[in-house]
UniProtKB/Swiss-Prot annotation:
Signal peptide: none annotated. The keyword Ligase does not apply. InterPro entries: Aminoacid_DH-like_N_sf, NAD(P)-bd_dom_sf, THF_DH/CycHdrlase, THF_DH/CycHdrlase_cat_dom, THF_DH/CycHdrlase_CS, THF_DH/CycHdrlase_NAD-bd_dom. Its EC number is 1.5.1.5, 3.5.4.9. The lineage of its organism: Bacteria, Bacillati, Cyanobacteriota, Cyanophyceae, Synechococcales. This is Bifunctional protein FolD. NADP(+) binds at G165, R166, S167, S190, I231. SUPFAM superfamilies: Aminoacid dehydrogenase-like, N-terminal domain, NAD(P)-binding Rossmann-fold domains. Keywords: Amino-acid biosynthesis, Histidine biosynthesis, Hydrolase, Methionine biosynthesis, Multifunctional enzyme, NADP, One-carbon metabolism, Oxidoreductase, Purine biosynthesis. HAMAP family: THF_DHG_CYH. One of its GO terms (molecular function) is methenyltetrahydrofolate cyclohydrolase activity. Belongs to the tetrahydrofolate dehydrogenase/cyclohydrolase family.
Length: 293
């Protein structure tokens, strides 16, 4: 039976650490860290995600600044809102909640965020820093995966890693982080032919393709570490990921569950990025080096 990569439990442990470290740093900084989440429109799923992030902030002592614009907000109105948050000294991290309503172009909006306040690690400058191996905010989901692997003593160095999916949100930064950890990395995607022959080479397999249960037992070699980034609602109810957990549990060495795997760690790494930005701004030295990816 596969080792359970329990992101929910790890996230809870890390929240306690973050809370303790924030309390140590408040005297030097003069205030708590601040995270601003900018939400456009009334997408129900986005509203739930934002509430979860606000609750996580409250648990660890990060001040949360919610900002909400209507679905018909113009590109210029969103740019103005971002610029106001850039100038707000209370704010250390800014997150633009995706996806955006139709008619808005996310690329220039993400580029408008102050790179030093980029809580999601998606600014072009920070993606470039990742590519060059320089310090900076990291994309939250792949960073969460790396911390999960580290927590279980799973070292990617020298291993064959396969990432299924090439999005700028997960797949591409995931591949770069694994490569930086000295894995030999292959990226597969929707145009990849003979996917099984590629995924079966993996000692570490990260699936972020956005297709429900697309990876089954035939796709892996026994003993593979499998990280499932996908999350989907089944027509009959309940949630599933991009892998068929029932098939993989008997053959994988380790497997992240859905829900309770990568999702909670994504939120935690958003908090980590915000707290680290707060530390840099106020020259606060905290014991968080093991959370830097």
């Amino acid at each position: 039976m596969a080792l359970r990569l329990d992101g929910k439990q790890l996230a809870a442990q890390l929240e306690v650490r973050l809370q303790q470290q924030i309390q140590k740093g408040i005297a030097a900084a003069g205030r708590s860290p601040g995270l601003a989440v900018l939400r456009i429109g009334d997408d129900p799923a986005s509203a739930v995600y934002v509430r979860n992030k606000e609750k996580a902030c409250a648990r660890i002592g990060v001040e949360s600044f919610g900002s909400h614009l209507p679905a018909d907000a113009s590109q210029q109105e969103v740019l103005t809102a971002i610029r106001e948050l850039n100038a707000d000294d209370r704010v250390d991290g800014i997150l633009l909640q995706l996806p955006l309503p139709e008619g808005l172009d996310e690329t220039p909006l993400l580029a408008e965020i102050d790179p030093n306040k980029d809580a999601d690690g998606l600014h072009t400058l920070n993606l470039g820093r990742l590519l060059k191996g320089e310090q900076g905010p990291r994309s939250c989901t792949p960073a969460g995966v790396m911390v999960m692997l580290r927590d279980q003593g799973i070292d990617p160095a020298g291993k064959r890693a396969v990432v299924v999916g090439r999005s700028i949100l997960v797949g591409q930064p995931m591949a770069l982080m694994l490569q930086a950890a000295n894995a030999t990395v292959t990226v597969a995607h929707s145009r990849t032919q003979h996917l099984e022959s590629i995924t079966r080479q993996a000692e570490i397999l990260v699936v972020a393709a956005g297709r429900p249960e697309m990876i089954g037992a035939d796709h892996i070699t026994p003993g593979c570490v499998v990280v499932d980034v996908g999350i989907h609602r089944r027509p009959e109810g309940g949630l599933c990921g991009d892998v068929c957990a029932e098939e993989l549990e008997p053959v994988a060495a380790a497997l992240s569950p859905v829900p309770g795997g990568v999702g909670p760690m994504t939120v935690t790494m958003l908090l980590v990025n915000t707290v680290l930005a707060w530390c840099r701004r106020h020259q606060v030295a905290l014991e968080l080096s093991d959370l830097v990816v």
